[in-house]
Regions:
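ABC transporter nucleotide-binding domains
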Residues: 3-8, 13-208, 212-214
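Conserved residues at beta->alpha junctions
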Residues: 15, 28, 191, 233, ...
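Short phosphate-engaging motifs
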Residues: 20, 70, 196, 234-238, ...
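Structured loop/turn residues at secondary-structure junctions
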Residues: 67, 127, 137, 230, ...
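Hydrophobic side chains in well-ordered alpha-helices
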Residues: 74, 237-242, 269-270
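A short linear hydrophobic-aromatic micro-motif
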Residues: 123, 171, 247-250, 280-285
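ABC transporter nucleotide-binding domain
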Residues: 173-261
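C-terminal coupling/interaction segments
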Residues: 262-306
Length: 306
């Protein structure tokens, strides 16, 4: 049995003459925290809506939780926090969650316990019986997150979940996502905050002009590490010898050399070699490429997330 909870091939969507999504081909595994990255207008939100069958594709195909797109029973097992949502602002957070719970077929003490647990988890229990018209943007966002988790979903779509949240609110969302991972829940995360994605996700896909153009596993997709060594004496023989341990070797100052190595496992042998040949090693500094740097490299300098 396949462990894929999302599997799509060639999904396309037109809005009039505009091709919003040209080729959405994705595979997301069970229990994965999957980041969906791209510049504004890349088709990310439209892609999510197609996966949720809120928008019907004009081409291609896909399956969610093993069922074709649009399967009604599948929807009951999925949670969704949209980027833009509108609540009935005359209702309290508790009333809103009760309303959404009934849409899922929940009722009675089970629903009440779920509501109390989620309101406490998103730090809204004290404000639960106030109309949401008086809520701040961050409080509304946390209400939306509670709604997305109300049915105890096996797959959750979070579209800009930290929008409007202060640093403590963003930390709370990150903690909740970690808890979902520990429970085996799959999270499909769309966010322009690359630092949050890098701290949270297992794997990411880059989308540009409606196409999936690159995927990478975070923490494993860096095929090299930049290394800066402060060493003396630094001469031509030493520079030549370093080529046995890495590439892209360049001298930046009188006692600093920069190079690329395949992994940290190279460092012990490299350090021993330097010491054995009589060099004085004053410092070794590793630097991995950040997700933002990968984003700019894949997308182009003019396509920073916004």
């Amino acid at each position: 049995m396949s462990d894929l909870v999302i599997d799509t091939w060639g999904l396309r969507k037109w809005f009039g003459p505009t091709l919003a999504v040209a080729d959405l081909s994705l595979s997301v595994r069970a229990g994965e925290i999957f980041g969906f990255l791209g510049p504004n207008g890349a088709g990310k939100t439209t892609s999510i809506k197609m996966l949720l069958s809120l928008v019907h594709p004009d081409g291609g195909n896909g399956r969610v939780l093993g069922q074709p797109l649009g399967d009604r029973l599948t929807r009951a097992r999925v949670g969704f926090l949209p980027e833009h949502f509108r609540f009935h602002d005359c209702l309290t957070a508790r009333e809103l969650l009760r309303f959404h719970g009934r849409l899922y077929g929940l009722s009675g003490s089970d629903l009440d316990m779920r509501i109390d647990r989620l309101l406490a988890r998103v730090d809204l229990l004290e404000a639960a019986d106030r109309p949401v018209r008086g809520y701040s943007k961050g409080m509304l966002q946390r209400t939306g997150l509670a709604q997305a988790l109300l049915n105890d979903p096996v797959l959750v779509f979070l579209d800009e979940p930290t929008s409007g949240l202060d640093p403590l609110g963003r930390l709370l969302v990150r903690d909740i996502i970690s808890e979902l991972r520990d429970r085996g829940t799959t999270v499909f995360l769309n966010s322009h905050l690359l630092g949050e994605v890098e701290a949270t996700c297992d794997r990411v896909a880059f989308v540009k002009q409606g196409r999936t153009i690159h995927e990478m596993v975070l923490g494993q997709s860096v095929d090299f590490i930049d290394l800066e060594i402060r060493v003396s004496p630094l001469d031509a023989c030493l520079l030549e010898g370093l080529s046995a341990f890495g590439s892209a070797i360049s001298q930046s100052t009188a006692d600093v050399v920069r190079m690329r190595v395949e992994s940290e496992a190279t460092l012990p042998a490299l350090t021993r070699w330097l010491v054995e040949r009589g060099a004085n090693v004053y410092g070794l500094q590793l630097r991995r490429k950040s997700l933002e740097e990968w984003f700019v490299e894949v997308m182009g300098e003019d396509q920073r997330p916004g």
